[in-house]
């Protein structure tokens, strides 16, 4: 590809992009289309380079996985924070293209939550807030990838809102399970949470 072609594709610094593509397995032929389709092609390309430095095998494998590659590029170009999060531990990348399952099941399982006789969830002894945090972000990566690769984001928005609301609800439930384990292991203390549903709660 030429710098002019990359500029037309959306890269603000096409000469730098051209040199970066030479560092990626498969080069521009494998990556340009998916990166240029992201919200910020330059950011996505730089993040792809960093991901390759962190885990060359992962990026090399994406050359032969077009669907996964498209989703990874969309996330890298759509959110610098999520990109940094994946680059810090490339094993997290699999959440971008694999369905993690229902939010409630994933987050409660992350803290080993079980129900008391009264129906309240209580976390397992060894569970930590970090386990919950990792599960939350695993689901969030999947939601973000679906949203960022949708051909009709407007039509998908209600579903994304519902999934985010379910994720927040599951996070609260799992967080409460951690708290109950330490202060109310029998789940006998009655209380309520009142929250505003400004962003799609249901």
Could you tell me what each predicted segment is?
Residues 1-202:
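Non-catalytic regulatory/linker segments of enzymes
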């Amino acid at each position: 590809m030429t710098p002019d072609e990359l500029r037309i594709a959306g890269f603000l610094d096409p000469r730098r992009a051209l040199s970066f593509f030479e560092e990626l397995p498969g080069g521009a032929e494998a990556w340009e289309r998916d990166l240029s389709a992201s919200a910020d092609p330059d950011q996505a390309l730089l993040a792809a380079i960093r991901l390759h430095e962190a885990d060359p095998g992962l990026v090399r494998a994406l050359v032969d996985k077009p669907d996964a590659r498209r989703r990874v590029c969309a996330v890298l170009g759509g959110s610098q924070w999520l990109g940094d999060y994946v680059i810090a531990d490339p094993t997290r990348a699999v959440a971008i293209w694999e369905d993690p399952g229902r939010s409630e099941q994933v987050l409660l399982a992350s803290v080993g939550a079980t129900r008391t006789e009264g129906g309240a969830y209580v976390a397992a002894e060894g569970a930590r807030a970090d386990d919950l945090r990792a599960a939350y972000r695993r689901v969030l990566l999947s939601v973000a990838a679906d949203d960022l690769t949708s051909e009709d984001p407007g039509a998908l928005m209600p579903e994304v809102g519902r999934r985010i609301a379910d994720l927040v609800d599951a996070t609260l439930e799992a967080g409460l399970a951690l708290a109950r384990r330490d202060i109310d292991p029998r789940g006998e203390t009655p209380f309520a949470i009142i929250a505003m549903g400004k962003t799609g709660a249901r």
